[in-house]
Amino acid sequence: NIDGKGQEGLELSREDSLRGEDGAKVVLRDNKGNIVDSLDSPRNSVPKNGQDMILSLDQRIQTLAYDELNKAVAYHKAKAGAVVVLDAQTGEILALVNSPAYDPNQPGQANSEQRRNRAVTDMIEPGSAMKPFTIAKALDSGKVDPTDTFNTLPYKIGPATVQDTHVYPTLDVRGIMQKSSNVGTSKLSAMFTPKEMYDFYHDLGVGVRMHSGFPGETAGLLRSWRRWQKIEQATMSFGYGLQLSLLQLARAYTVLTHDGELLPVSFEKQAVAPKGKRVIKASTAKKVRELMVSVTEAGGTGIAGAVDGFDVGAKTGTARKLVNGRYVDNKHVGTFIGFAPAKNPRVIVAVTIDEPTANGYYGGVVAGPVFKEVMSGSLNILGVSPTKPLSNTATVKVPS
């Protein structure tokens, strides 16, 4: 910019290292102001260049995500939305977009809603997008196997009833994932103490700052396990009662894509692959990835996110919003998050649509199509080869 100073975002947060230092030279001038000699002086100094910052953002993926998000926000007459795209093996941020947004060349014309970087600063309750982690915890402990079957009829915890959108008398663990069963997920969570589940969520990064370098990033919200009611342990297992940003949620999914290790996220290109923190066993992460493919197959809640030519592991989420301390039935956040190729993930895409008011509100309906186009285009841009035969009607959107 013309001011030579960082105004917002990464440029502002890294201003001290990017700006460099001016040099100084003591000179002798004649009576007309012309320099006639340079003098030795302790005040002389050599100018220093600022440090380079090479961003990991891919302009092609960024443009694709921005266009698809804006179309969805308009079509569903939503309040807002956001998309995050991560490298599934390094944690590098390939795209991060928000809607509404503004022209950074004309910041004075933007209002506060347009200036918010929602994917980093805003907390959401992820809803069913948290279920893969509850399932992972149960599998990792050895308490269950993917073929174990559970009674998934509605049941009570105190005065509250835990139930599913559709009634399923029994489901195995794969079915709990595919059908997005609140009942099944809550029963898996009940196998552990509140402290064990709290520690697990904490290890996933919930309630912990990411130190991404972006100003205003939220830590999310995870209340002390000592304050949990019995029903809260159940609801947290399917994404109510804890909060995190969309970027935090995408980061948590690196546990599944990077063989059980939580990766740091970065807006800068990484010269060396970062070291992750072990959360679950590599074998568990592989099992969960396999289960999540069923979500985008026939009978799954995320069929709208299926990408031709690829096995896609994904999860939908639909959460009612908390207004004045109560969950309301007319305001929702729809989420769709997943990775591909499922066996050896290269990309994580996370989409959230806030308060859709037209043409549906479920995560699979409002966020699924955005996920599909962004994932398909990202894989194509990155040159990832298909993992299964292509149909004859496939089209891929790639910005020029």
UniProtKB/Swiss-Prot annotation:
Its EC number is 3.4.16.4. It is an enzyme of class 3 (hydrolase). It is found in: Cell inner membrane. Pfam families: Transpeptidase. Gene3D superfamilies: 3.30.450.330, DD-peptidase/beta-lactamase superfamily, Penicillin-binding protein 2a (Domain 2). Pathway: Cell wall biogenesis; peptidoglycan biosynthesis. Its main location: membrane. Residues 1-21 are annotated as: Disordered. The keyword Transmembrane helix applies. InterPro entries: Bact_Transpept/Beta-Lactamase, Beta-lactam/transpept-like, PCN-bd_Tpept. Keywords: Antibiotic resistance, Carboxypeptidase, Cell cycle, Cell division, Cell inner membrane, Cell membrane, Cell shape, Cell wall biogenesis/degradation, Hydrolase, Membrane, Peptidoglycan synthesis, Protease, Septation, Transmembrane, Transmembrane helix. GO terms for cellular component: plasma membrane. The active site is at residue 128. One of its GO terms (biological process) is proteolysis. The keyword Cell division applies. GO terms for molecular function: penicillin binding; serine-type D-Ala-D-Ala carboxypeptidase activity. It catalyses: Preferential cleavage: (Ac)2-L-Lys-D-Ala-|-D-Ala. Also transpeptidation of peptidyl-alanyl moieties that are N-acyl substituents of D-alanine. It is a single-pass membrane protein. Catalyzes cross-linking of the peptidoglycan cell wall at the division septum. Belongs to the transpeptidase family. FtsI subfamily. The enzyme has an N-terminal penicillin insensitive transglycosylase domain (formation of linear glycan strands) and a C-terminal penicillin-sensitive transpeptidase domain (cross-linking of the peptide subunits). This is Probable peptidoglycan D,D-transpeptidase PenA. It comes from Neisseria flavescens. The gene is penA.
